[in-house]
């Protein structure tokens, strides 16, 4: 491990503030060090704990980051002027025209071409697209400034 790496300096460089984060300081330290390709055992040695504890801290941190992403996506959904539900079984090439039509109706300009929109969907929801078909119900939201957010939806929804 590079002895010159200081977790405090890493966190200061990115402006981490534990009071404003869903991560604990220790979780942020572990993630920052892992992003610098430091092995868990070396991080444990640096922070005075076991590799197993570092593994647990990292796993919890990544879960917290994913929960935060989902929370932001939910908050964006509440204010997005464009919300499009895509059913499982939909041909992926039907998605862009559907999204663009909804955006036109709302007077919102989407910032993605068809191929980039489909790539965004595929990247956002694991297993969403297989063999040119949507595998899980999706919610596609577009903000006033054209930013697209994609979430997988539960197949069971109550009205």
UniProtKB/Swiss-Prot annotation:
<dbReference type="Pfam" id="PF14601">
    <property type="entry name" value="TFX_C"/>
</dbReference>
<dbReference type="GO" id="GO:0003677">
    <property type="term" value="F:DNA binding"/>
</dbReference>
<dbReference type="InterPro" id="IPR036657">
    <property type="entry name" value="Tfx_DNA-bd_sf_arc"/>
</dbReference>
<dbReference type="GO" id="GO:0003700">
    <property type="term" value="F:DNA-binding transcription factor activity"/>
</dbReference>
<comment type="similarity">
    <text>Belongs to the Tfx family.</text>
</comment>
<dbReference type="GO" id="GO:0006352">
    <property type="term" value="P:DNA-templated transcription initiation"/>
</dbReference>
<dbReference type="InterPro" id="IPR029291">
    <property type="entry name" value="Tfx_C"/>
</dbReference>
<dbReference type="Pfam" id="PF04545">
    <property type="entry name" value="Sigma70_r4"/>
</dbReference>
<dbReference type="InterPro" id="IPR007630">
    <property type="entry name" value="RNA_pol_sigma70_r4"/>
</dbReference>
<keyword id="KW-0238">DNA-binding</keyword>
<comment type="function">
    <text>Putative transcriptional regulator.</text>
</comment>
<keyword id="KW-0805">Transcription regulation</keyword>
<dbReference type="InterPro" id="IPR004645">
    <property type="entry name" value="Tfx_DNA-bd_arc"/>
</dbReference>
<protein>
    <recommendedName>
        <fullName>Putative transcriptional regulatory protein rrnAC0199</fullName>
    </recommendedName>
</protein>
<dbReference type="InterPro" id="IPR018384">
    <property type="entry name" value="Tfx_DNA-bd_euryarc"/>
</dbReference>
<keyword id="KW-0804">Transcription</keyword>
């Amino acid at each position: 491990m590079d002895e010159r790496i200081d977790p405090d300096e890493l966190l200061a460089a990115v402006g981490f503030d534990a009071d404003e984060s869903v991560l604990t300081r220790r979780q942020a330290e572990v993630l920052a060090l892992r992003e610098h390709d430091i092995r868990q055992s070396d991080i444990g040695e640096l922070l005075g704990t076991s590799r197993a504890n570092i593994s647990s801290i990292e796993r919890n941190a990544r879960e917290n980051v994913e929960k935060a992403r989902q929370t932001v996506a939910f908050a964006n959904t509440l204010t997005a002027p464009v919300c499009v539900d895509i059913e499982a079984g939909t041909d992926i090439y039907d998605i862009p025209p559907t999204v663009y039509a909804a955006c036109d109706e709302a007077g919102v300009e989407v910032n993605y071409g068809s191929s980039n929109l489909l790539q965004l969907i595929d990247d956002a929801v694991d297993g969403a697209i297989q063999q040119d078909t949507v595998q899980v119900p999706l919610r596609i939201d577009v903000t006033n400034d054209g930013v697209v957010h994609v979430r997988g939806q539960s197949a069971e929804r109550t009205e």
